[in-house]
């Protein structure tokens, strides 16, 4: 059984590919059930964010696990192969440690990914998809992330994607305080972005969400109001800034809707930031005059601020991670011996029961207990000594020398020459 991590991220694949492989939160239970049922994995956890889709699993066949991913999304291997990475054993652990520590993020050192990883593990746990191997991996992953953040400055001076959204808007408009801002969706990402915009005291904050009640709860945090997604077409023209991040599998803001809004605005500019994967806004919207449409990949340059200082801290973090990977590798090797230990104990127990059964029969016949115990001890001694004695009597050359050294070390013997 292999520990395997595979998937793609913002380093290896453009948004147009990443959105094809996304797992909305509501699909995770079904996806995990399907993966385990396919027997391509015994344990599994799926991490799906705007920047990455990764599967961590215990798999008897890495190729089968990858085939499942392609089949689940209706994609061909050839279509995905150029963008995928596959990591096994210690390399899979190293990757998990780096991801949780923010070293593999678009924003070096950002903390949001750690929460997303924990959410993925909780989803896998609720689906009954976690076992000893992945539990061991993720317990260590979260411990490493905590150690990195407490021991280094890797997260210092970072510009989050949420803060970058405000900076982008300020490049287009002179002041956020004069703007009407619309947030589409009511999840964690929208809440983070809304917090940064609210700090600039915009003229109006509105949250559009599929369920009005959830939208209202979020809007109230920022003194705003809420509308339903059905109200978007008639309301869109009111807003100067539109930030979207929903779990919709299809775009919810189309070119026609935005064209009508821009016309109603008399061609005043509109800033749109689509943080969803798959995208919430049709790609063609970006071709419209007076519309400034950005995706998660477009804000990469802004989040580079302060990266040099964090890069130095990242080198310290890599040293910590390397040490913890070595410890995890030792744990993996010990796990591999568990079946052998179990088989060894089973064999010893069979020998014990066989000898005991014979001794009890002798006692039942009236044999002297002393003789029965003596025979029992001799029988067990011979049984235990037969395998090493046979090994010492067989083989030749280097093989024999290795067996001699192994048995001497195993039994802690130091025979005189």
Curated annotation (Swiss-Prot):
Among PROSITE patterns, the record links this protein to: GLUTR
**MF term (GO), any:** NADP binding
Q: Does the keyword Transcription apply?
A: no
What catalytic reaction does the record list? (S)-4-amino-5-oxopentanoate + tRNA(Glu) + NADP(+) = L-glutamyl-tRNA(Glu) + NADPH + H(+)
Q: Which GO terms describe its biological process?
A: protoporphyrinogen IX biosynthetic process from glutamate
What's one Pfam family here?
GlutR_dimer
Record's function text: Catalyzes the NADPH-dependent reduction of glutamyl-tRNA(Glu) to glutamate 1-semialdehyde (GSA).
Q: Please state what the annotation says regarding this protein's domains.
A: Possesses an unusual extended V-shaped dimeric structure with each monomer consisting of three distinct domains arranged along a curved 'spinal' alpha-helix. The N-terminal catalytic domain specifically recognizes the glutamate moiety of the substrate. The second domain is the NADPH-binding domain, and the third C-terminal domain is responsible for dimerization.
Name of the protein described by the UniProt record:
Glutamyl-tRNA reductase
């Amino acid at each position: 059984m292999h520990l395997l991590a595979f998937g793609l991220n913002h380093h290896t694949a453009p948004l147009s590919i990443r959105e094809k492989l996304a797992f909305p939160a509501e699909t995770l239970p079904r996806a995990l059930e399907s993966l385990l049922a396919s027997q391509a994995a015994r344990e599994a956890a799926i991490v799906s964010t705007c920047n990455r889709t990764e599967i961590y699993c215990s798999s008897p066949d890495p190729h089968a696990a990858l085939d499942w991913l392609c089949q689940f999304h209706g994609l061909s291997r050839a279509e995905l192969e150029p963008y995928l990475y596959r990591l096994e054993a210690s390399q899979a652990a190293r990757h998990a440690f780096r991801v949780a520590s923010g070293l593999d993020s678009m924003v070096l050192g950002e903390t949001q990914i750690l929460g997303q990883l924990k959410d993925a593990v909780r989803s896998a746990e609720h689906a009954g998809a976690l076992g000893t191997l992945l539990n061991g991996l993720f317990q260590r992953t979260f411990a490493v992330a905590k150690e990195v953040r407490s021991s280094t400055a890797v997260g210092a001076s970072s510009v989050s994607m949420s803060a970058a959204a405000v900076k982008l808007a300020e490049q287009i408009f002179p002041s956020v305080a004069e703007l009407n801002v619309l947030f589409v969706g009511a999840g964690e990402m929208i809440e983070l972005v809304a917090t940064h915009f609210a700090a600039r005291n915009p003229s109006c904050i509105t949250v559009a969400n599929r369920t009005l009640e959830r939208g209202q709860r979020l809007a109230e945090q920022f003194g705003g109001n809420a509308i339903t997604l059905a109200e978007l077409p008639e309301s869109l023209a009111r807003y100067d800034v539109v930030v979207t991040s929903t779990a919709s599998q299809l775009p919810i803001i189309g070119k026609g809707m935005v064209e009508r809004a821009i016309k109603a605005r008399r061609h005043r500019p509109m800033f749109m930031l689509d943080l969803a994967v798959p995208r919430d806004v049709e790609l063609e919207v970006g071709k419209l005059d007076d519309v400034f449409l950005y995706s998660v990949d477009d804000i990469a340059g802004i989040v580079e601020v302060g990266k040099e200082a964090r890069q130095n801290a990242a080198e310290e973090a890599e040293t910590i991670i390397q040490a913890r990977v070595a410890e995890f590798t030792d744990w993996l090797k010990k796990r591999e011996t568990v079946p052998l230990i179990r088989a060894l104990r089973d064999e010893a127990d069979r020998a014990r029961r066989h000898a005991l059964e014979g001794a009890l029969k002798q006692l039942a016949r009236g044999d002297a207990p002393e003789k029965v115990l003596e025979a029992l001890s001799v029988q067990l001694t011979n049984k235990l000594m037969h395998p090493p004695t046979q090994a010492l009597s067989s083989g030749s050359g280097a093989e024999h020398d290795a067996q001699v050294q192994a048995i001497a070390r195993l039994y802690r013997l130091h025979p005189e020459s």
